[in-house]
Amino acid sequence: MGLSDGEWHLVLNVWGKWETDLAGHGQEVLIRLFKSHPETLEKFDKFKHLKSEDDMRRSFDLRKHGNTVLTALGGILKKKGHHEAELKPLAQSHATKHKIPIKYLEFISEAIIHVLHSKHPAEFGADAQAAMKKALELFRNDIAAKIKELGFHG
């Protein structure tokens, strides 16, 4: 299920566009996630009080967390599937500390695809979207396996 060199090129090319504003794009991804799947907000104690989209847009902490999420994901994507070392601590924290259901990884992947397309439509055509979906699926499958190894099946 790995990606070809051409697919990785498409993924990393559009990712390069995002790196100019990881905090802003990350905040947009989290807003999209919370609006599309309000139940996900309950897993974030420090964001539960953000009831409206305006509250979310004004939140420095949400922007900061968006940066953290996309920085970690970017580091994983740049490994082109050789991300074992990066996944272990991420799986550990998501399974034991945050207890994030595996299904939520699919939800955030959908949000990433949506925001990428809305922000960079020229660079994120059908081929790039397909490649990114494949890369995110690879990430999700690998981290889900690690999370399950830790005994968390949420």
UniProtKB/Swiss-Prot annotation:
Class of this enzyme? oxidoreductase
Sites where the protein binds heme b: H94
- Which of this chain's residues are annotated to bind nitrite? H65
Catalyzed chemical reaction(s): Fe(III)-heme b-[protein] + nitric oxide + H2O = Fe(II)-heme b-[protein] + nitrite + 2 H(+); H2O2 + AH2 = A + 2 H2O
- Principal subcellular localization: cytoplasm
GO terms under biological process: removal of superoxide radicals
One Pfam family for this entry, by name? Globin
Localization recorded for this chain is:
Cytoplasm, Sarcoplasm
Q: EC no.?
A: 1.7.-.-, 1.11.1.-
| Superkingdom per UniProt | Eukaryota
Positions carrying Phosphoserine are S4
Q: Which UniProt keywords apply?
A: Cytoplasm, Heme, Iron, Metal-binding, Muscle protein, Oxidoreductase, Oxygen transport, Phosphoprotein, Transport
All residue ranges annotated as the Globin domain in the record: 2-148
Carries keyword Cytoplasm? Answer: yes
Q: Which GO molecular function entries does the Swiss-Prot or TrEMBL record give?
A: heme binding; metal ion binding; nitrite reductase activity; oxygen binding; oxygen carrier activity; peroxidase activity
Summarize the protein's role. Monomeric heme protein which primary function is to store oxygen and facilitate its diffusion within muscle tissues. Reversibly binds oxygen through a pentacoordinated heme iron and enables its timely and efficient release as needed during periods of heightened demand. Depending on the oxidative conditions of tissues and cells, and in addition to its ability to bind oxygen, it also has a nitrite reductase activity whereby it regulates the production of bioactive nitric oxide.
* Family statement drawn from the similarity comment of this UniProt entry: Belongs to the globin family.
Subunit-level organization: Monomeric.
Database matches in PANTHER family: MYOGLOBIN (PTHR47132:SF1)
Q: What is this protein called?
A: Myoglobin
Q: Which organism does this record belong to? A: Pusa sibirica
